Amino acid sequence: MPDLLAHSVTPPAWRAWSRHLLDHITPTKAPILVGHSSASALVADLAIKLPAGGLIIVDGDIPPEQGRASPVRPALHDVIRNQADADGVLPVWSRWFLHDPQRAALIGLDRLAQDPVALARFEDGLPVMHIDWFDDSIELARWDHVPAGFIQASPIYDHATAEALRRGWPVARLGGTHLHPTLCPADTAQAILSLVHQLDAGSGRTQLTDASRKTGLDTDRR
């Protein structure tokens, strides 16, 4: 939400973020929450606090069933620590991977950069972060009883797709990039709605969604 993460504004502390978001969520009965990327841990936390009727993770790590959850994986933390300036301030997220073209392509930054106006608008909504912000963690209450689904937008999250299938979640594969929600919002919305229908129906079967079949993407090979 741009009003919460405006450029040059530090977001709430990681451990306080889900509580902060509660103030901006319109109360509704058993909502289904959607979290992209690192927000996967936030929706798991919110799913218990609300409580939620279900959650969908889009191209993010699947949080532990309970216990400590950090903003990023340790390997990424090491990468970004080296990019902090003398005061510990990081460049905006989209510039973390400027020297890694392969990673930038998996994220979709190369495609976004083809439109300088769109890139500038995108970066203007990104917060300026201090490296110490990423040292925080949240303690998740047990949430694995909440119905959940997973949308894989990029190959970055092959491991998360495998974990979702192991847990018996419905999974959609979009064959895009990490920024698929930004670059292809209609396609992403279709996949979300397809999973919502499955969660509403209470189907516990592990399967690929209609969104995956319609785009001719890979099938479940388990």
Predicted regions and their residues:
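Flexible "cap/lid" loop of the alpha/beta hydrolase fold
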Residues: 52, 56-93
